[in-house]
A protein has these predicted regions:
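Short sequence/structural elements of tandem HEAT/ARM alpha-solenoid repeats
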Residues: 191-195, 251-252, 270, 320-324, ...
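Active-site-adjacent structural elements in folded domains
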Residues: 184, 188-189, 193-223, 276, ...
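Extended, Lys/Glu/Leu-rich amphipathic alpha-helical scaffolds
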Residues: 94-95, 113-116, 248, 256-304, ...
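Secondary-structure capping and boundary motifs in well-ordered enzyme cores
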Residues: 135, 224-228, 245, 249, ...
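N-terminal transition regions in large eukaryotic proteins
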Residues: 1-225, 236, 240-243, 397-406
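Contiguous, well-ordered alpha-helical segments that form the cores/surfaces of helical PPI scaffolds
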Residues: 198-202, 233-241, 251-255, 281, ...
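Eukaryotic basic, amphipathic alpha-helical target segments in cytosolic regions
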Residues: 43-46, 151-155, 181, 185, ...
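Hydrophobic/aromatic-rich, well-ordered segments within soluble, folded domains that form packed cores
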Residues: 141-147, 228, 308-332
C-alpha cells in the first residue's frame, strides 16, 4: 500500500450502512421507538401552538452556553425578529459581530429538549414519515420547526404575498422549478410544481424593496439582498416535502434562508464561492494526497463541488438520505456541509485515487449515505484547527467572511 492509498481517516461505525433489508427494518423500528420515547415528555411541543412552558424551555435551549448553541445563535440570529426586505436589526448586527467559540461538537450531556434532539440526531436517524408523533405529525416536521425556532405562523402574511401573483423573478423561477429533483418520483407526487413556484414568488415579494422608503434603503438594510437566485428551488424543495402545510414550509424556508445561509443566496453567490474555497482548504489539511491528486487533474472544488455546496447536497439522491443529512445540518449548522462533502470524497477515496479521470466519478456522485457521511464528518471536525473552523462557521452568514467575493 502506497502512502497515497493510506487514508488519514479512521473508519467510524455506522448505524445502517451495509445492513441487509431486514436489518435495516430492525434499525428503523428501533429508531422509531427511541424517538417516541424522547418525544413522550414533549408532546405539547409539536408545532407553533406550543404551550408557554414549552416556549420557555425552547428559549432556554437557545441561550445555553454550549458551544454548539452559541454558534447556532450566531448563524441564525435565533430568537430575534426577522427584518423584512433584506435588512437586519441592531440585535442581529451585534449577533453577527459577536466572537465565535473555538470549537463545536455535539452536546455530550443534553438536558433541554432541543439539545436532546440534536444529540439524538447524531446517533439515531429520525423515523420515516409513516411513523407519527403522539400528536399525529411526522417527527421530522416537528424537529425542523424546533431547530429553526418556529414559534408561530402568520397565515395572513403568506396569503397576502401569494395574492400579489407573479413576482419580478417569476420567469427565472419557472425556468428552474420544473427541473427540481426531477428524477425523484416521490417528490413529484407530493410537491406539485405550482406549490414551489408559489412559495418562491412569495419569498421574492416578501423582500421586494421597490416600495421601500428612503429611510429603509440605508447601508444597514443593504447587508443582505434577498431575491431569487439559482439553487433556491432546490433549497426550498425539502421544506415543501417535509412540512405539513405550505405555510409552514414558507415560514421554515424563510427562516432558513434569512438566518442560516443568507450569503448563499446573494446575487454573486458569495457564500457558495467562499464555501468552495474552504472545501479546498479542508481537503488539503485532512487528506493531502487526495487533494494533490485532484489538483494534478486541474480539479478544484469550484469545478467538481459547486452543485453540492450550493444546494447543501440536496442535488444528490436519494431524497430520504438528503433529509437525514439536513437533520444534521439544521441541528449543528449549514457550515458542516463543507465537511460533509469532504466526507463523501473520503468514501470515494480509493476510486478517485485510482482513476485517471476522477471528474467522471465526481460528475455522478454515488447515492448519499447520510449515516456514514455524518459519522465521518463528526470525525473530521475534530481535526479542524480553531481558526479554520471559525471560518467555516461564519462563511454562510457573516459579511466579513466573503469580502473578497463581493
Amino acid at each position: 500500500m502506497t502512502e497515497a492509498d493510506r487514508s488519514p481517516f479512521s473508519a467510524p461505525n455506522t448505524l445502517d450502512s451495509g445492513l441487509s433489508r431486514s436489518d435495516q427494518e430492525d434499525v428503523a423500528g428501533t429508531s422509531a421507538r427511541e424517538w417516541k420515547t424522547l418525544f413522550a415528555p414533549m408532546q405539547s411541543n409539536a408545532g407553533p401552538s406550543s404551550s408557554a412552558a414549552t416556549r420557555a424551555s425552547i428559549k432556554r435551549a437557545n441561550t445555553t452556553e454550549s458551544s454548539v448553541s452559541i454558534r447556532q445563535q450566531q448563524v441564525r440570529g435565533r430568537g430575534g425578529p426577522p427584518r423584512g426586505r433584506g435588512g437586519r436589526t441592531q440585535a442581529s448586527r451585534r449577533l453577527l459581530d459577536a466572537s465565535d467559540a473555538a470549537a463545536s461538537s455535539p452536546p455530550s450531556s443534553p438536558t433541554d429538549p432541543v439539545s436532546r434532539i440534536r444529540h439524538k440526531i447524531v446517533t439515531t436517524p429520525l423515523p420515516p414519515d409513516s411513523v407519527l408523533t403522539p400528536t399525529g405529525t411526522t417527527y421530522r416536521s416537528v424537529v425542523w420547526k424546533l431547530l429553526l425556532d418556529i414559534r408561530d405562523l402568520d397565515v395572513a402574511e403568506y396569503l397576502s404575498l401569494v395574492a400579489k401573483g407573479k413576482s419580478p423573478s417569476h420567469d427565472k423561477i419557472r425556468n428552474d422549478t420544473f427541473r427540481t429533483l426531477a428524477t425523484d418520483q416521490g417528490f413529484k407526487e407530493r410537491v406539485k410544481e405550482e406549490k414551489l413556484i408559489r412559495l418562491l414568488d412569495a419569498f421574492v415579494w416578501k423582500h421586494n424593496r421597490s416600495d421601500d422608503s428612503a429611510d429603509e434603503a440605508d447601508a444597514d438594510a443593504d447587508v443582505y439582498e434577498f431575491s431569487y437566485v439559482q439553487g433556491m428551488n432546490v433549497l426550498a424543495a425539502p421544506f415543501l416535502y417535509t412540512l405539513e402545510s405550505e405555510v409552514e414550509a414558507f415560514r421554515c424556508f424563510s427562516r432558513f434562508i434569512e438566518y442560516c445561509c443568507p450569503l448563499y443566496v446573494q446575487p454573486t453567490l458569495s457564500g457558495v464561492h467562499r464555501g468552495l474555497q474552504l472545501l479546498d482548504r479542508c481537503l488539503e489539511l485532512l487528506d493531502a494526497p487526495l487533494y494533490h491528486h485532484l489538483r494534478g487533474k486541474n480539479l478544484s472544488a469550484e469545478i467538481y463541488a459547486f452543485p453540492s455546496v450550493m444546494t447543501l447536497c440536496a442535488c444528490t439522491p436519494p431524497l430520504p438520505e438528503v433529509l437525514q443529512l439536513w437533520d444534521f445540518l439544521l441541528a449543528f449548522g449549514v457550515h458542516f456541509n463543507v465537511l460533509c462533502i469532504v466526507a463523501q470524497l473520503h468514501i470515494m477515496r480509493a476510486d478517485l485515487l485510482e482513476s485517471a479521470s476522477p471528474m467522471k466519478l465526481l460528475r455522478n456522485l454515488p447515492p448519499l449515505d447520510a449515516r456514514k457521511i455524518i459519522n465521518v464528518t463528526v470525525t473530521l471536525a475534530r481535526d479542524i484547527p480553531a481558526d479554520l473552523f471559525q471560518d467555516l462557521v461564519k462563511h454562510p452568514y457573516h459579511p466579513d467572511s466573503v469580502a473578497a467575493f463581493t
